[in-house]
Amino acid sequence: MSLRSHLSRLLRTQVHSVRKKSVHSVAVIGAPFSQGQKRKGVEYGPAAVRXAGLMKRLSDLGCHLKDFGDLNFTPVPKDDLYNNLIVNPRSVGLANQELAEVVSRAVSGGYSCVTVGGDHSLAIGTISGHARHCPDLGVIWVDAHADINTPLTTSSGNLHGQPVSFLLRELQDKVPQLPGFSWIKPCISSPSIVYIGLRDVDPPEHFILKNYDIQYFSMRDIDRLGIQKVMEQTFDLLIGKRQRPIHLSFDIDAFDPTLAPATGTPVVGGLTYREGIYITEEIHSTGLLSALDLVEVNPRLAVSEEEAKATASLAVDVIASSFGQTREGGHIVYDQLPTPSSPDESESEERVRI
């Protein structure tokens, strides 16, 4: 291990040792929005993830919760294509503006903000709202796709494949002004984002990644390096020189479709359960997670109720492991074992037998 990597890991361990007994204050925002793409059903993602036990799981971890409920986005009655291609630009722009306000309120109130989508165009709003209070944030984008097409390079017209292009400062001379998007201010730079899990990248996106020096780890890189080394290098890049808030944007299609079948754009050869949860466990261990998106759960695309439940349950695992659930068992701090000399000796003995 390099000296830099060793020092970075040591610093993260020290931060974790200070914070490991702290209680997370977590705000949960449901974002039932589907107009960043054309497949219906992803608007039911928040309800599915809630039904899979999200709030109880976070509560059992000792989190102090504030539930903003599922947002009611303002409908746009007439939302014509932009440039005869881009789908629902006004709806996407307005929904993200509304979401950014709620995320901003949550972060300013001292909460770690969890947004459950909904499609990945919502990251425009979550990262914009987060950056208002944490302008130096770093983004870890876990996804099968880079989502960095511009409105001029996209072939699908779907804005859930373009959110990063609106957020990245270096791309602003390549991005036209879409109706409904005038409020957006680019808020991250190329060195402030790292991709993990890529395996379906369009040619223009690959050009952007290479020519704008954006760090990414494809599934081939994960196979070659191993997920531990990928996370070490990710942290070296984002927090190796200075500690700063982390925004984790996690698309459920980062996982292999055998694990997360109920999603709109599945791609074979994705993350295993162990790899995906290792990512979130390591992010939690930094003590720096400030906001998390969990997107693209689409229960309507499951071929069975079991597939829908499995995908939603996996989403809950991703979120819970980001806030302290471990595979050794997620526990509220247990400070002391009962002793035979305690007043409730018989009751303690019975508890130990159980």
UniProtKB/Swiss-Prot annotation:
The segment annotated Disordered runs over 332-354
Q: Which GO terms describe its cellular component?
A: cytoplasm; mitochondrion
Residues annotated to bind Mn(2+) 2: D143, H145, D251, D253
Q: Does the keyword Ion transport apply?
A: no
Gene Ontology terms for molecular function: arginase activity; manganese ion binding
Q: Which reaction does it catalyse?
A: L-arginine + H2O = urea + L-ornithine
Among the GO biological process terms of this entry, one is: innate immune response
Tell me the residues of the organelle transit peptide: 1-22
Q: Where in the cell is it found?
A: Mitochondrion
The UniProt entry, under CDD domains, shows: Arginase
Q: Does the keyword Hydrolase apply?
A: yes
Q: What is its EC number?
A: 3.5.3.1
- What cofactors does the UniProt entry give for this protein? Mn(2+)
Q: In which pathway does it act?
A: Nitrogen metabolism; urea cycle; L-ornithine and urea from L-arginine: step 1/1
| Subunit-level organization | Homotrimer.
Q: What does this protein do?
A: May play a role in the regulation of extra-urea cycle arginine metabolism and also in down-regulation of nitric oxide synthesis. Extrahepatic arginase functions to regulate L-arginine bioavailability to nitric oxid synthase (NOS). Arginine metabolism is a critical regulator of innate and adaptive immune responses. Seems to be involved in negative regulation of the survival capacity of activated T cells. May suppress inflammation-related signaling in asthmatic airway epithelium. May play a role in promoting prenatal immune suppression.
Protein name, UniProt field: Arginase-2, mitochondrial
Q: Which organism is it from?
A: Bos taurus
Lineage, broadest ranks: Eukaryota, Metazoa, Chordata, Craniata, Vertebrata
